[in-house]
Design a protein with these regions (language model features):
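Surface-exposed patches in mature extracellular/periplasmic domains of secreted proteins
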Residues: 31-34, 85-94, 245-249
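Active-site-proximal beta-strand/loop segments in catalytic clefts of secreted hydrolases
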Residues: 34-36, 48, 59-61, 106-111, ...
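Active-site/substrate-binding loop(s) of hydrolase catalytic cores
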Residues: 52, 67, 74-76, 80-219, ...
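Di-metal (Zn2+ and/or Mg2+/Mn2+) metal-binding site signature of metallo-dependent hydrolases
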Residues: 63-69
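Short glycine/proline-enriched loop/turn "hinge" motifs that connect secondary-structure elements
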Residues: 47-49, 146-147, 162, 260-266
């Protein structure tokens, strides 16, 4: 019987309980809490494998993109099941994968925001967010919410052109806490982001994947920086998923997790914009999203021949 639920809206409690249950059921999954949000919700981390190659997968930087969380949870569960049965995942022997790679999975970077969008936030939190939302009446509430409960967009918090991101977003009118695109008062001001940055600095991974929605597109570079091997890997991701491989738009090329990673380490980093439609995407899209991205996750972990 599967532990990961893919047919109900995701909440921070469901994510946390799922992570704990997976770690209890499968010895191949190790779990810990990276940090807590300002509102006391845990930001979970799962680790699998003990290989030399290191990769970090993240999901739900943005609240209304929570469908990416069960994608990573299901990947972890299917890999653990394949290890138990001596089977394969996306055609790759599970034992081969975990001997080659160590996989770090952060399934929900923004638990506060996710709870707001999926109806699990408490009354006081909803009221606080509603006040922020009043500054942006053109954004649906709560479905248009991407930020955390401080009204800060977590994927605009990294020290990679943060001042330029602020300039762009302020010019677009995002000058105060709200549902989306507010960069905060300073980079790394939010504990969720600081914890992920510290994890990344501790691990120094060979590659990172940041799962978002939507558009069925893969963004692979930033600021004209072309990391050796990154295009080749991106083209393979595109082939496996059917997603377009695209340059990051200039207005979105600053202060994001993938942007910071590429600038900091000159290693491959990818934003995976899964699914199609208007966020939050319906759960009816989950199966297709998972099928489309399973090869990306598996190949990111194994690497390409000759790497």
């Amino acid at each position: 019987m599967n532990i990961v639920k893919t047919d109900v809206p995701m909440t921070s409690q469901l994510c946390h309980e799922t992570v704990l249950a997976l770690a209890e059921r499968y010895p191949s999954i190790r779990a810990e809490t990276m940090t807590e949000t300002d509102f006391g919700r845990p930001v979970d981390l799962m680790m699998m494998g003990k290989g030399e190659r290191k990769v970090i997968f993240t999901a739900a930087h943005h609240a209304n993109e929570w469908i990416t969380t069960p994608v990573l949870l299901k990947f972890a569960e299917e890999l653990a099941q394949a290890l138990e049965s001596g089977g394969r995942i996306f055609g790759v022997p599970a034992q081969t994968l975990v001997k080659a790679a160590t996989i770090y999975i952060v399934p929900m970077v923004n638990p506060d925001g996710v709870d707001l969008v999926t109806g699990a936030a408490n009354r006081r939190e909803v009221a606080r967010a509603a006040v922020f939302a009043e500054n942006y009446p053109g954004i649906p509430f709560p479905d248009g919410w991407k930020a955390n409960l401080n009204g800060v967009d977590l994927n605009l918090q990294y020290p990679a052109g943060w001042l330029r991101a602020r300039e762009i977003k302020f010019a677009q009118g995002y000058t105060r806490p709200g549902p989306r695109d507010f960069v905060g008062r300073a980079p790394l001001s939010q504990p969720e982001v600081k914890a992920l940055l510290l994890l990344t600095e501790a691990v120094e991974p060979d590659l990172v994947l940041a799962f978002h929605t939507q558009g069925e597109v893969i963004y692979w570079q930033v600021g004209g920086i072309e990391v050796p091997g990154a295009r080749r890997m991106g083209e393979e991701f595109s082939r496996l998923s059917g997603y377009e491989l695209a340059d990051t738009p200039e207005e979105s090329a600053y202060a994001g997790y993938k942007d910071w990673f590429i600038q900091r380490y000159r290693r491959p980093g990818y934003t995976i914009e899964a699914g199609l439609g208007e966020n939050p995407l319906p759960l009816e899209q989950f199966d297709k999203i998972y099928r489309d991205t399973l090869g990306i996750m598996t190949t990111a972990a194994t690497g390409l021949p000759g790497e």
